[in-house]
Curated annotation (Swiss-Prot):
Membrane topology: Multi-pass membrane protein
Keywords assigned: Glycoprotein, Host Golgi apparatus, Host membrane, Membrane, Transmembrane, Transmembrane helix, Viral envelope protein, Viral matrix protein, Virion
Protein's organism: Human coronavirus NL63
Gene: M
Assembly behavior: Homomultimer. Interacts with envelope E protein in the budding compartment of the host cell, which is located between endoplasmic reticulum and the Golgi complex. Forms a complex with HE and S proteins. Interacts with nucleocapsid N protein. This interaction probably participates in RNA packaging into the virus.
Name of the protein: Membrane protein
GO cellular component: host cell Golgi membrane; membrane; viral envelope; virion membrane
Length: 226
């Protein structure tokens, strides 16, 4: 048996001694990944985002350390370590670039969510609400249930009246801003219940912050370039 091989007995002893600990750690890891969504638990969501944000610098540091260890020792692994370092750095830079491009449109911290590729923006009672989504939808549905406003099933605001449903909804992505106009609705003013459906009408380099008016203001029509 070579010196680099690990005896099966040592592996068995390690698993026997640390089985419960690894079971607990992996179970917690699964819970954080599966239920780490902001609509379920803000605590788990915060832990999940912290893990994702820490992985980039950790992986980059490990790749750089591997380059240092394999330099002038194993040129094959040194080459792979250099390649992994470059790939990790490029992915990390791309994340920050896309996050800042999205942030300049909507001015919300959701732009730095690693899981977010688009943000739905709307305004009710003068307050802007944002909903992060994986991709820009082709249509957006607002549902009002006894004054509770939901966007595609996600609770956004309470004590909303049917007359306050916006005439348009904005969907911002890193590369463009999509304006979705209201094309249909069905409301009941007595029970403050109903729905409104919005589809894509135009897109461009607009601000992703919804205005209080029913149409885009002149300020929002200006190019939002850095």
């Amino acid at each position: 048996m070579s010196n680099s091989s690990v005896p099966l007995l040592e592996v068995y002893v390690h698993l026997r001694n640390w089985n419960f600990s690894w079971n607990l750690i992996l179970t917690l890891f699964i819970v954080v990944l599966q239920y780490g969504h902001y609509k379920y638990s803000r605590l788990l969501y915060g832990l999940k985002m912290s893990v994702l944000w820490c992985l980039w610098p950790l992986v980059l540091a490990l790749s750089i350390f591997d380059c240092f260890v394999n330099f002038n020792v194993d040129w094959v692994f040194f080459g792979f370590s250099i390649l992994m370092s470059i790939i990790t750095l490029c992915l990390w830079v791309m994340y920050f670039v896309n996050s800042f491009r999205l942030w300049r449109r909507v001015k919300t911290f959701w732009a730095f969510n690693p899981e977010t590729n688009a943000i739905i923006s709307l305004q009710v009672y003068g307050h802007n609400y944002y909903l992060p989504v994986m991709a820009a939808p082709t249509g957006v549905t607002l549902t009002l249930l006894s004054g509770v406003l939901l966007v595609d099933g996600h609770k956004i605001a309470t004590r909303v009246q049917v007359g306050q449903l916006p005439k348009y909804v904005i969907v911002a992505t890193p590369s463009t801003t999509i304006v979705c106009d209201r094309v249909g609705r069905s409301v009941n003013e007595t029970s403050q219940t109903g729905w409104a459906f919005y589809v894509r009408a135009k897109h461009g380099d607009f601000s992703g912050v919804a205005s209080q008016e029913g149409v885009l203001s002149e300020r929002e029509k200006l190019l939002h370039l850095i």
